[in-house]
């Protein structure tokens, strides 16, 4: 069912707004046929089709089980230059940081921000370990879910931001829109916020939550349209 005020067709807007990386939280959803993926599209072709329309996607499977090396290489091969994956890291698995870093590096230039989910209370030792486990060139988006992490932004290095925060010293921001449905007016308001960040020469990554129906790509496409105005 089309979202009110938003067309059901998703067009190629991936390169229309410089600095804006807008996409969805995943791509491997058979229920997105036929409204997003054409009838007959095979699951192994979903990513290639998705990457023709958007420049980024959240890679949530890495937060539950780290895929084998060949899969990262295949994902990189199936996406065009300029496309970026945002892998998920569950920060409670401290012993896995090194392996995770090596594995996602196989994405090469397709590696975007790493979203590190931290459910625990503020722990400076964990933060130091997490930040030190990745090359300073790697963008880190910290998904800090305990209230004790409030006002941490000022203490983060130049390659790290807090998910959802519009503040920080890093040259990028990371937004997750998780409360659908979104009206066209609400998307327009987000477009205004993001445009302000782009005007500051910041890169902005923005992801819509997956639902069974392809509302997420519709929202993403509409947001890109609004940003391009």
Question: Which ranges hold each PLM region?
Answer:
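Residues lining hydrophobic/aromatic ligand-binding pockets adjacent to catalytic sites
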Residues: 1-229
């Amino acid at each position: 069912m089309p979202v009110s005020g938003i067309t059901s067709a998703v067009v190629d807007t991936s390169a229309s707004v410089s600095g804006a990386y807008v996409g969805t939280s995943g791509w491997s959803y058979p229920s997105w046929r036929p409204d997003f993926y054409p009838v007959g599209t095979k699951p192994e072709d979903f990513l290639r089709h998705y990457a023709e329309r958007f420049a980024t996607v959240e890679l949530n499977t890495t937060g539950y089980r780290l895929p084998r090396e060949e899969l990262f290489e295949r994902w990189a091969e199936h996406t065009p230059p300029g496309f970026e994956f945002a892998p998920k890291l569950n920060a409670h698995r401290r012993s896995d940081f090194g392996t995770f870093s090596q594995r996602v590096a196989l994405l090469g230039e397709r590696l975007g921000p790493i979203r590190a989910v931290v459910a625990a209370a503020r722990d400076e030792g964990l933060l130091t370990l997490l930040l030190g486990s990745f090359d300073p060139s790697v963008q880190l988006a910290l998904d800090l879910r305990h209230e004790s992490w409030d006002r941490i932004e000022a203490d983060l290095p130049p390659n790290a931001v807090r998910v959802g925060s519009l503040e920080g010293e890093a040259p990028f921001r990371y937004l997750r829109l998780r409360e659908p449905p979104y009206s066209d007016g609400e998307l327009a308001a987000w477009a205004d916020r993001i445009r302000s960040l782009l005007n500051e020469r910041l890169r902005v990554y923005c992801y819509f939550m997956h639902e069974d129906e392809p509302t997420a790509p519709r929202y993403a496409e509409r947001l890109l349209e609004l940003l391009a105005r």
